[in-house]
Amino acid sequence: MRDRRHEAGQALFEFGVTLPILMALVLGVIEFGYALFQVQLVTSMAREGSNLIARQVTINDAEAALQTMSGLVRFDANSTLIFSVVRLGVGGANNNVPIIVQRHSVGAFAASSVLGDPPQSAYQGSPDYYAYDPDNDGSIRVSGVLPNGFTLTPGESVYVTEVFTQRTSIVPFMPLPAMLHASAYF
């Protein structure tokens, strides 16, 4: 018969060696799942925002709905929400040029819209944030590209919601993106 007293020490040593590897694996799976959840949440918020403003809900009401939608994405220093309505200009210097006729952003997170960043002073205030001079103000022109080569026709509107947020991390050593961005075009 063998003496099992020496084997108990070996098992404890093997457990001590494998425990950090198993913990890293478990925490990595949890972090990756949490990151996927955050991506899904931001995408869902962008889609819901565009859905609301496409149904002629005021931008203020859409903003309030999105702020109550999630406790994880708060539109403060860590997140930004941008609502835009894009149309073709109907006259003046912006005739047949895609322009942002309505625009409102919430939050202080440094983010740039894919459509461009016209000054907030070019737009009226609450509740709908219409452009003051959509026919002649060159600063409200779309400077980015619309998705998939989308072209506007006269009288057509594209409702865009963009959500930018700083991703929160459970495990700091995972090389996942620090910023999440989602946009929805309706």
Model-derived segments and spans:
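Extracytoplasmic beta-strand-rich oligomerization domains located immediately C-terminal to a leader/signal peptide
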Residues: I53-P98
